[in-house]
């Protein structure tokens, strides 16, 4: 299996500048490569994307009409033509390498030429708040399963199976980790990450606080789901926790992965199922870099719901008052003049009419 990286990447990233991040917190530069074979339909499709923190800034698709590495963030567009030419040459070289790798891997696993297979790589570096390297990494996968990974010491490899051990032996013999990956991750990757952070600092170093709310969803006659939402925040790192009377409900909380909102920000929610009528005992706590301090949210019934409840109660009272008034009026009409009183005798024609009663006979 050929060495995929970072030989070509060293050419691409040789013009690195040493710049210092201007915001506390860690940052990352990561690349994701995917090659998918398609027997009978030509060369494998190759897609590459690059991310600074949570922002995609470059992309290449071998099926795209341009056939070039393309910018995906406004701040990287300020790079000149030479940068994009180098990026394109490098990524096309990597695509060719991946095409060969797919054939090699198919042989390692004794697979036929009929099926489609996938080769993936993720690599990059993380910087700490002081601008120094926290960690470097390179991980390879085949058909969705781990294949081989660079260890934290940046000097050795971990193979996932016997096929990957073949690659491991080749790379160890060639000194791939020590001579290429370690140098790239400790030096070149760090320098380019600092450069990108400086170029895109207005976007990358911002901290957009989340907008938060709690929604109410009946589950049954006895239970409801309270869902705590965090929307429109950046960067993606955020913590949502539910508490009941001040005690964490981690084990009973359903939390989804942070998701891109499509506008450069992120969204996330965490939910708990609670007994009906006990909603006010539960609080959602949100922590994010864009917040001066953590915030707490409870479910608050909407004003419309309160108006409806009050209106229904008032209507019930009016109905009850009307019934009581009708009963009193009927009593006054029929027997409300005291005991011993009796109607005077009258003709049948007077029954049911409003004629005055005649004086009783003596």
Swiss-Prot record:
CDD domains: IgC1_MHC_I_alpha3. GO terms for cellular component: external side of plasma membrane; extracellular space; lumenal side of endoplasmic reticulum membrane; MHC class I protein complex; phagocytic vesicle membrane. It is a single-pass type I membrane protein. This is DLA class I histocompatibility antigen, A9/A9 alpha chain. SUPFAM superfamilies: Immunoglobulin (SSF48726), MHC antigen-recognition domain (SSF54452). Glycans are attached at residue 110. Heterodimer of an alpha chain and a beta chain (beta-2-microglobulin). It comes from Canis lupus familiaris. Its main location: membrane. Residues 1-24 form the signal peptide.
């Amino acid at each position: 299996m050929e060495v995929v990286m970072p030989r070509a990447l060293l050419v691409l990233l040789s013009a690195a500048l040493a710049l210092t991040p201007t915001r506390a917190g860690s940052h990352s530069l990561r690349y994701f490569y995917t090659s998918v074979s398609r027997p009978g339909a030509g060369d494998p499709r190759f897609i590459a994307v690059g991310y600074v923190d949570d922002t995609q800034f470059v992309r290449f698709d071998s099926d795209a009409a341009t056939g070039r590495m393309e910018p995906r963030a406004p701040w990287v567009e300020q790079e000149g033509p030479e940068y994009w030419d180098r990026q394109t040459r490098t990524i096309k070289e990597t695509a060719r390498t991946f095409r060969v790798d797919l054939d090699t891997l198919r042989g390692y696993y004794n697979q036929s030429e009929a099926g489609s297979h996938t080769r993936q790589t993720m690599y990059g570096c993380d910087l700490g708040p002081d601008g120094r390297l926290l960690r470097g990494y390179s991980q390879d996968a085949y058909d969705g399963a781990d294949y081989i990974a660079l260890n934290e010491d940046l000097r050795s490899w971990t193979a996932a199976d016997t096929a990957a051990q073949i690659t491991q032996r080749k790379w160890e013999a060639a000194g791939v980790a020590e001579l290429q990956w370690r140098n790239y991750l400790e030096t070149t990757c760090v320098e380019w990450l600092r450069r990108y952070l400086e170029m895109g600092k207005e976007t990358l170093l911002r901290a957009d606080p989340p907008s938060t709310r709690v929604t109410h969803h009946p589950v049954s006659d006895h239970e409801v789901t309270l869902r705590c939402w965090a929307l429109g925040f950046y960067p993606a790192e955020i913590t949502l926790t539910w508490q009941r009377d001040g005690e964490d409900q981690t084990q009973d909380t359903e939390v989804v992965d942070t998701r891109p909102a499509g506008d450069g920000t992120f969204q996330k929610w965490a939910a708990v199922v609670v007994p009906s009528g006990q909603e006010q005992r539960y609080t959602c706590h949100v922590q994010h870099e864009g917040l001066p301090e953590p915030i707490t949210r409870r479910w608050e019934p909407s004003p419309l719901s309160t108006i409806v409840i009050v209106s229904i109660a008032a209507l019930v009272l009016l109905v009850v008052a009307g019934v009581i008034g009708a009963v009193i009026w009927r009593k006054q009409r029929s027997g409300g003049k005291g005991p011993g009183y009796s109607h005077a005798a009258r003709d049948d024609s007077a029954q049911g009419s409003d004629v005055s009663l005649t004086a009783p006979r003596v």
